[in-house]
């Protein structure tokens, strides 16, 4: 793993979710409290996967890259956000934390074409169009290149996604997670996420404050 400290953190929410999700708010609150010097960004993603990634790439255009000395970025993604985070990590070479990540998003969301409401604001609706399935397929990562760059938090109790697919995708060649946990229970939302937040932030290798 690279030893360059992380100075910028991106959080990507899941399908029908928002920056107001419980996990996103927990991370944002902890970053503001303990790591105020770190740049933290959690955007509201549009329904179109192509537009979502175009917007993210614009947002992070001036963030540290692989060639930036002494600084690095990292990404956290939940569910569909984990799918996006994986694509972004492969594009940029950054560290990634994936929380019950979608592995076959195009397949899984092909049944979700139509109108939906946000989990956190039922009055906020959006249309998930058929062409978005192909946009998801274009972002697929058949195999991650460096498992050591990923921390995966996977719940066997996930009622939405197949934990075995997640484990197979993020494990090393011996079938084990180099970083992360396979939870025996929990659920898709990872309701016990506060129990693992410190571990997640430790993995990110956040830059220590100048006064610390």
Positions of predicted regions on the chain:
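Glycine-rich phosphate-binding loop signature in dinucleotide/nucleotide-binding domains
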Residues: 3-4, 63-71, 145-146, 206-211
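Active-site catalytic motif of lipid deacylating hydrolases and related acyltransferases
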Residues: 5-69, 187
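Structural motif
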Residues: 8, 72-74, 95
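Short hydrophobic segments within beta-strands
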Residues: 10-15, 76, 153-155
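A structural signal for short coil/turn segments at secondary-structure junctions
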Residues: 35, 67-68, 92, 173-175
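Gly/Ala-rich beta-loop-alpha elbow adjacent to hydrolase catalytic centers
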Residues: 76-81, 85
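Active-site signature of alpha/beta-hydrolase-fold catalytic machinery across serine-
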Residues: 87, 91
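The alpha/beta-hydrolase serine catalytic core
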Residues: 94-212
């Amino acid at each position: 793993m690279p030893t360059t400290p992380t100075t910028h953190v991106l959080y990507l929410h899941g399908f029908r979710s928002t920056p107001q999700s419980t996990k996103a708010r927990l991370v944002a609150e902890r970053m503001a409290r303990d790591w105020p010097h770190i740049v933290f960004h959690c955007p509201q993603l549009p329904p179109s996967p192509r537009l979502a990634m175009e917007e993210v790439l614009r947002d992070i255009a001036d963030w540290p890259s692989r060639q930036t000395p002494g600084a690095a970025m990292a990404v956290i993604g939940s569910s569909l956000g984990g799918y996006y985070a994986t694509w972004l990590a492969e594009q940029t070479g950054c560290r990634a934390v994936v929380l019950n990540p979608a592995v076959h998003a195009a397949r899984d969301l092909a049944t979700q074409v139509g109108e939906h409401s946000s989990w956190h604001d039922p009055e906020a609706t959006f249309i998930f169009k058929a062409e978005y399935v192909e946009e998801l397929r274009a972002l697929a990562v058949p195999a991650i290149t460096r498992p050591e760059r990923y921390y995966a938090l996977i719940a066997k109790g996930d009622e939405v996604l197949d934990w075995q697919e997640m484990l197979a995708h993020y494990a090393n060649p011996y079938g084990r997670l180099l970083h992360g946990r396979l939870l025996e229970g929990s659920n898709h939302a990872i309701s016990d996420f506060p129990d693992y937040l410190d571990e997640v932030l430790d993995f990110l290798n956040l830059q220590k404050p100048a006064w610390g």
